[in-house]
Each structure stands twice: as C-alpha cells, then as structure tokens.
Amino acid sequence: MKLWKTASRFLPLSFLTLFLTGCLGEENLTALDPKGPQAQWIYDNMILSIIVMALVSIVVFAIFFIILAKYRRKPGDDEIPKQVHGNTALEITWTVIPIILLVILAVPTITGTFMFADKDPDPEVGDNTVYIKVTGHQFWWQFDYENEGFTAGQDVYIPVGEKVIFELHAQDVLHSFWVPALGGKIDTVPGITNHMWLEADEPGVFKGKCAELCGPSHALMDFKLIALERDEYDAWVEGMSAEVEEPTETLANQGRQVFEENSCIGCHAVGGTGTAAGPAFTNFGEREVIAGYLENNDENLEAWIRDPQSLKQGNVMPAYPDMSEEDMEALIAYLRSLKVME
C-alpha cells in the first residue's frame, strides 16, 4: 500500500514530463528535422539506436513476464525447483547477440566519425569553397569570411548544397557552436583551433546556439545561419565586400555622426571601418533579431542602447541612458539604413 501511495504521487509527474516533450519551441531549432547530410546521419543513427533498444527491451520484458506468470510460486507449492548451474547454449546466445547489436551500431558510427573528420574541400566546388572563421565571445558570435575579406556578426550566411569549412576559436571562455538542423556541436576553446564542416540541403534560416554554459547570458547566445542559393549568396558577398555608402536620408546621416561621436565605431565595424570588439554592423538593418534574441524593432533597439545589462547580463556593451531622443531617433535610423541586399 505504501509503495502504491508513493507511486501515485510521482505518476502525474511522469505524464507531465511526457507532455512537456511537445514544448519544442522554434521549429528551426531541432535535430529531429534534419536539413543537411550531417544532421541526417545523426538522425538516422538515433532512429537505429532507438529501434535496437526497443527490440532488446521488448524481448527482455517479454521473457521476464512469461517467466513471472508461468513459474511463479503457487500457494501450497513447497517443492524445490530443479537447480541449474549453467547452460552453455544460453550463455553463448546472450553473448553473441549483444556483440551483433554492437557491431550494427558501431559500423555507421565509425563511418560517420570519419565523414565528419573530413575537412577537405568539395572537389566539385574547388577554389570556391567557403571558409569561415568562427569566434565565440561572451555572448555573441563573430564570423570572419577570410577569403572574401570581411566580417559578419550574429548572422552567418552559406551557399546551399556546398560543404562549408568552419574554423572555430574562443575569445574568452569555453563555448560550443551548434546548428541542430544541420549537424552536431563542437566546442570553441581559448587557445585551441577546432574545425568542422556543415552543408545545407535547402535554402532557409536555421537557428544556432551556444551549447556550453559560458556565463550569465549563455541561454541568450543565439545566432542564425542563413542558407542561400549560390547566386544570392554571391550577391550578399558582393554587398558585404563593397564600400559602405553614406546614407541618403538626412536623419540617417545625422545618425551616422551620432554613431561616430559616441565611439560606437570603436567596437562595431561597418564595412571595412571599425574593429571587431563587438558584432559587425555592415548589414544590421537586415537582421531579424538584435542581441541574439530580441526582435529587431525600434523599441527593443532603444532599450538595448540605453541599458544593455537589463536585457543581457554580463555583456560588455556600454550603456547610453542619457542619450537625447533626437540623437536616439537618428542613430536608429542610421542602423536601419545599413543593408547590403535589395
């Protein structure tokens, strides 16, 4: 009775856990809907493992319940059962079967390990292979397109159907680079260079995250990977590489002056101007989110500029609580004007 009372308390929690599995959140942040060869391999092997575990569980529990029902002690049955001290056939069987199951799991695992470790460019792409240097900062991502000669922040663009090589670094603490829909995760470690490759099967926007606890705003260290058709990707690269023109609108041009006078250019590069202490702003006006998770609208942008610590604790962005409304409006107009795609 006591056991049943204890179980009845935890049973609702078990069902609650089952229901919570439906709270997946954003559909582009899941490994269960693969959009690339790496992610597909991970998904297929996960399904294979589940099938193997399910078959083993079914067989083991079936034998368990059959024996429990057939050979359980009955009332008045005091006879001592026949004592068995070994069965060679059974022992061989329950040794060979696990070996076979392990081989079934080991072969694709080893094959995939070598596939993931292959960092050579795709022969079909050759010299057009995209190389991206990824640097993890608290709490944002920097993407350097070394062959093209420019830097992007928070949003990383790749061409569809091509193997893209990533070189991973960390500026401060341990991070982990992960785009669930396209592949597995890999750590970025201070002082150590890691490599990986990803490929997208179709155009789309795929959410990425830091998958290693790195500080108070770790959960907000998100980014987006945008996969484009090759011609669109080339147009984006051309726009990012071009010299940034002065804004044509008066308000945005005033905002550019506010941007420079408040030393924003000292941290946020625009085109080839500025440094990479913070995310590059060359295409800021095209981003869907700011600070990794906030919708890119005027209200959120002003709140971020005035008090970034209230929105993302532990970041190094200075606050500008006393900036006038006129300067703030002009600065936001300037940031909105920073686009490279029509």
Swiss-Prot record:
GO terms for molecular function: copper ion binding; cytochrome-c oxidase activity; heme binding. GO terms for cellular component: plasma membrane. It is a multi-pass membrane protein. Residues 250-342 form the Cytochrome c domain. Pfam families: COX2, COX2_TM, Cytochrom_C. Keywords: Cell membrane, Copper, Electron transport, Heme, Iron, Lipoprotein, Membrane, Metal-binding, Palmitate, Respiratory chain, Signal, Translocase, Transmembrane, Transmembrane helix, Transport. GO terms for biological process: ATP synthesis coupled electron transport. A lipid is attached at residue 23 (S-diacylglycerol cysteine). Its EC number is 7.1.1.9. This is Cytochrome c oxidase subunit 2.
